[in-house]
Amino acid sequence: RCKAKGDAQSIETLKETYLEAADKSIDYYRDLSHQLYGRDIPYVLLMHIGALDAEMLPRLLDLYKSRGFEFVTLQQVESDEFYRSSTDLRLPAAPDMLEGVAGERHIPMPSQPQLSVEPESLCK
C-alpha cells in the first residue's frame, strides 16, 4: 500500500524497520537459545517471500553475516539435537520452537522485542 500511494518516506521507514526487527530477533532468539542450551542452536530462516522480502534479502543476509551467522545445509541443521524429535519419527513429539521448550521447562520468556515504528502505522 505504501508503493501504491507513492509514499517513499514510509517505504524507507518500512525497510529500516524490517532490518531493525530482524536484528532484534537475532538477540531475542540467541538469548533464549543460550538460556535453554548454553549455545546457539543452528537456526532455520523461514521466509514467505513478498516484494519487500525479495528486495531486502541481500541486506538481511548481510545483517546475519555481520552478526556472525554462517549458512549451512538443512542436513547439517537437522543433525543438531534440538531438531532430533522433528527428524526421528521414532521419538516422541517435542516442542519444535525455542518458546515451546521454555514453556515445557517452565522458564520465563524474555520480553518480545519492541520496534521503534509499528509497520501497521505506515501508509494508511
Question: What residues fall within each predicted segment?
Answer:
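Structural preference for beta-strand elements that scaffold enzyme active sites
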Residues: P42-L46
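Alpha-helical scaffold elements lining the catalytic groove of polysaccharide deacetylases
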Residues: R1-R39, D53-M56
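C-terminal domain-boundary segment and adjacent tail
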Residues: R39, I49-K124
